[in-house]
Amino acid sequence: MQLFITVVSLCMIVTAQSLLLRHSPRRATSIFMSSSSGAAVALSKNNLVIIIAGPTGVGKSDVAAKICAKHQGMIVSADSVQAYRGVQIGANKPTLAERAETPHLLVDMVDASEQYNAADWRRDALSCMELLLNKNPVCIEQGNCNPKLDQLNKDIADARHLKGYDAEARLRPVVVGGTMMYLQWLVHGRPDATRPTEQAIQKAQEDIERFQGQEADGWEKAIEYVSSLNPIFEDRVQTLSGRDWYRLRRTMEIAYSVLDQDDPTLLESLYSGERQGGLESFGYDVRCFFLCPSDRMKHTAVVDQRCEEMILRGLLQETTDLKVSNNLPDMATKAIGYRQALEYLQRSDAKTGDADAFDAFLNDFSTATRRYAKKQMQWFRKDGTFAFVPVLLKSSKADRVDATAKMIHDMCQLSRQDYEEALLPEDAAGNVPVSYQARLANNEQGKKMKLYQFKRYKLEKGSKEFESMLEQADECMVRLKEHQEQKTAPAEKRPRLL
């Protein structure tokens, strides 16, 4: 098995191309073969939507940009932090130059003060697809139009003009990101639980507070009460562990919402495990790809180096500026990078010149990012709808971007049946498709990651770069402390604004 995995890691790209040749003898010209007129080669499938996921640092944006450039496509960002205006370094947001070269939708969509969740993003992503493919938005027929529809329409119209695309041309939606919940909601649909009504939310909160006020046996009485509403909810609450008031309240909200509507079919569909409204239910030909690093050790080193680069580019300065100006979104405070920066800068025992604390912050940031990349790989290995596309890290950046984009293109040219067969552990001829080989290799390499040796590249303790960043960190810490003191000072002691 170990020998097999090693061979797979070295030969994935060649094997993938030969497998696709066998599957698609009549496939269209490669995206990297220019037509005689020099025009972009258009994909033949009118309703094709491409989804590109992958762990942080694997090169998703570069691959997506290559595909968009050849197919008159636009990137639909699936990143929970990039949707907010103001954030940049900590969100790894594309630069203005990159966005001019490849239009990005759902970036800079909302202000820091707004709440923007998976349901909001899914709604906006679906609207983007309809507008890019020149479909009449479903919401117009249903009378529940997206409140951001006008903004999305304008963003797409501006991007068409910038790129010189015809106003009526159907553009290719290329959804790119690593936020797992967002992609799950988009591809597989919303969870089976009903969205609670405002009345149900208020009633549940009042009832929870009443039970919480009953000292010793409040939890038991609350469980008994919810169980009495319906056997479905009894089964649900019996699985709760500890005194999980949050999940109990959520169950109450769903119960009140469903029972108030007096519709037995709603009860039947609750907690069925089935998700409603996946992309395919809208008539799209959805092709999902996970960019899988061929060498996890090398990829993890790339992640560590990327964390250092973010610090050197000014992550601490950006975090401080956003916090002081009250423009740091609540979502960002929980995101890797911003969260560690705030914890470090606002620590209770803070003092200037503390090299050990700064060194610990660097370690915490890198460790959290590595763990997130690992979680992304674990998550998508369990999702059989994503084709694992090996990214050969030993190649130059340009070569691996070209090879990865070409493989995605070729898989999009397969018939639906051949594409789905390429996702299976074994095809009709008894061969192990490349996607499954990549899954196996990724999982096998994960068993050896305990041997990974963390190293610094520029921010070694005592280095010139380390000392420079420590000085910047001290300045940020002082600014945040002064900001906090000003906020908590009595009104008469606060400086007057002229």
Predicted regions and their residues:
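Compositionally biased, intrinsically disordered low-complexity segments enriched
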Residues: F4, L19, P25-A28, N144, ...
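N-terminal chloroplast transit peptides
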Residues: M1-A42
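Detector for intrinsically disordered, low-structure N-terminal pre-sequences
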Residues: T6-V7, I13, R27, A40, ...
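Phosphate/pyrophosphate-binding catalytic cores of soluble transferases and nucleic-acid-acting enzymes
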Residues: F32-L498
